[in-house]
Amino acid sequence: MRVASIIINRPAKQLHKPLSYLLPEKFGDVKAGTRVLVPLGGSREEGILIGYEELLEKPTFTLRSIIDILDSDPWFTREMMDTAQKISRYFLCSFGDALRLFTVHKTLKSYDAPKEEWLVVTPEFKIDQLSPKKRKQRELANYLIEVGGAPKSLLRAKGYSYMVIKQVGEEHGIHIEERFKDTKTSFTELLSGEETIPLTEAQQIVYEPIKQMMDLESYNTFLLHGVTGSGKTQIYLKAAARCIGKGKTAIILVPEIILTDQIVRRFVSTFGDEVVVFHSKLTISERNNNWERIRRKDSHIIIGARSAVFAPAEDIGLIVLDEEHDTSYKQEDMIRYNAKNVALWRGMAHDCPVILGSATPAITSYYKALQGQYKLLELPTRIFDQPMPNVQIVDMKEEMIRGNYSVFSDAMTHLIERTLADGNQMIILLNRRGYSTFVMCRDCGETIMCPHCEVAMVYHQAGEELRCHYCEHHEPIPSVCPKCQSKRIKFFGSGTQKVEEELRRHFKGARIARLDQDVTKHKDMGEEILQDFGKHKYDILLGTQMVSKGHDFKDVTAVGILTADSVLNIPVYSASERAFDLLTQTSGRAGRGDKVGSVVIQTYNPLNYAIIKSKAHDYLGFYNEEIVNRKDLGYPPFREMIYMVIRHAKEEMAESISQKIVDDLETNFKSPSIDVNGPYEAGIKKIRDMYRLSIMIRGENLDAVKDYIYNSWIFTQEGLLIDVDPI
C-alpha cells in the first residue's frame, strides 16, 4: 500500500500542510513534483505529489485515493520543492503558495511549448518602402536585411518597442512566421568567448576566486563591494560566459524592471539569443515562451527582477544579485519573501557561487562578510581611475532665511544652468510622485483624505484628480472644503509632476523627461525614455528612486537630489541606511564618462551622518557608525524580527484578535531574549477599509517562534499579514 503526501493547489491557509492519499498501483511509479487530481470534501482538486512511502500494514484510519495523474513529467524538481519548503517555513507562508512562485501562472495550468514569432525578410522588401522619418523602423528593417530574420523576443531585448516591431512586421515583403527555437550553441565556443571579455587588473583579481568556485562546482557567497562605476557588470559578464561555457545556466537579478533594459543590452550584445528576460511587464504569452525556453534548455542566461530567481533551471551554475542592498528584492505583498534568501538557497542546492554586488552593500550583508559568512571582494576605485563626483550639501533652512522658498536652491539652479550651457545632461531625484503631496483647507485645516484609507489624497495634474497611492481611489478636485465649505483650498508639497512644471518654467528650451510609476505603468514607456535619454534626446531626467540606480549615461555630468529628508524620515529602523544608499547611488550616476561629475544634495538635516558620509562616498565610515547604533538598539543583524499586521473591517475585532495573538505568544515565549511588542496602531491605521494593528517580535533567534506560529491557530488567522525580516 502506497501513501502519498499531496499539497492541494489552492491558496487557502487551512491547506498549508500536505494531506495523505492512497496512490493506486495502477499509476505505477509517479515522480515527486507531478500534478495529481484528488478528492477533497465534495469536490475534486488539483494537487502536487510531494512523495510517497510504502506501508506494510493497513492504517487504522480511512484514506481516499488519488483519482488521476495529470502530467507525464513532473512540474517541479526536487530542488524546487525543497526550496519552496524553506520559503514556507522561513517566511511563514503555505507550501502551496511557495510552490506557485516557481510557475508562470498563479494556477498550475498546463500548456504546450509555444512557438516563437519571427520577422523574416523576403527579396520583395525594399528599404525605400519606409519613410526616412521612421528612423527606428528603418533601423530595425536594416538589421533584419542583414540577418535575414529574428525572433520578436530578441528584437524586444535589443530595445525595439512593441509598436515598432508591429509596424515593420506589417510591411510588404516582411513575413511573420512561427518557429520552434532551434538552439545549436556550442558550449566550447562560448567558453572560448570568455576570453573576449576584458578585465582590468583589479577586476581580474576579484574574478579569480569566483572562477575557482565555478570550476570546483562549489557553493560560496561573494559580496562584491565596488564603488559606482567600478565595472561590476563586466565581472558578471565574465562569470556568466564561463558558466554557460560549462553548459550551465546563469541567473542575473536586478532590483527594478526599469533596469533590465540596460543590462539586457550588455548581455545580448555578448551572448545573443542565449539571453532570456523575466519581469512582470511581460505578457502571459511572453512569459510562457521564456519559461519553456529555460525548461527546454534553449537559453542559459536568465535576466530579470526578483521573480526570475524562480526560473525553472535545473543546472544553475551562477546566481548574481546586482544592487543587492535594494529593498525591491523583498516582496511587500502576498508572500513576503526576499529574493536574496531564495538565491542563496538555490545556489547552495546547485553547488554554485552567488555574487551579491553593490556600491552600498546592505548592513547585514557587510556584517556577514566581516564575520566570514560571505567572501568579501572589493573594487574601491572607478574603472580607469575616473574620479568620484564632487558633492555639495545645501542646508535648505539657510535658503529660506535668505528668502528663497523655491524647490530649487541657488546652488541647484546654478548647477542646472551650467549643465545646460555646457551641453551636458542631468538627473534630478525627487522621491515623491504626483503634483502636490496633499490638499488642505486654509480656513479649517481639513486635509482631504482617502475615504478608504487613512492617508492624504495626492493631487495629480494629469486628469485633474486626487488619487490615493494605497488603494488607487481617485476623485475630482473639490471646489469647496468638504468640511466647512470654504473655497480657500490649497495644494501643498511638490511631487514629480509639479517639479517638472517648475523646470519647464525656469529653464525654457530644456528638454525634460519624467520617470516615475505614473509613467512606467504604460508598457515600454519607461525603457523608451531611458533609451532616448541615453541618445541625448533629453537634457534633464527627473524621477523618483528608479532614476537612482544601475544607469550608465556618459553625458550625465550633474545630479540633483531635491529632498534627502524624504527617506531619512520614514518610520523604519533602516531609514539611515536607505538614505545613504539612495544618496550614494544617485550621486554615482554623475561623471561616468570623460567629465568630472557634480552633485547637489538639498536637505534640512545637513549634519546627519548618512548625508555627511554619502557626500564623501564613505561606505565604511557609514557602516561603522550604523552598526554601533544597530547593536545598541537591538536591530538586525544582532536581532531577528517578525512584523505582524492584523486587518479587520471592524476596529474592535482587529484589537481583539491582535491582543489574543500577543497573549498567546507571551504565554509560550517567556524568555528574556524574545520581546513581543504590541499591539499598536500600524503606520497607516486603515487601508482599503480594513483597520490595521501591528505586533513586533524581536529576538536573537526566532526559529522556535516561527515553528510555533506555523503550527498554531495564528498561522491560519484570516486577515493576518506576516513579514519576516522586515526592511
Q: Which residue ranges define each predicted feature?
A:
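Generic structural motif
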Residues: 119-121, 176, 391, 457, ...
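A general secondary-structure junction signal
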Residues: 51-53, 103, 178-180, 430-432, ...
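Accessory, non-ATPase domains that flank or precede helicase/AAA+ motor cores in DNA-metabolism machines
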Residues: 1-358, 370-386, 671, 684, ...
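A short, contiguous, amphipathic alpha-helix enriched in charged residues
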Residues: 3, 31-32, 653-666
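Polar low-complexity intrinsically disordered regions
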Residues: 1, 428, 484, 667-668, ...
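Short, charged low-complexity linear motifs
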Residues: 6-8, 418, 677
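Inter-lobe coupling/hinge segments of SF2-like helicase ATPases
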Residues: 194-200, 204, 217-655, 663, ...
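A carboxyl-terminal module marker
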Residues: 663, 667-687
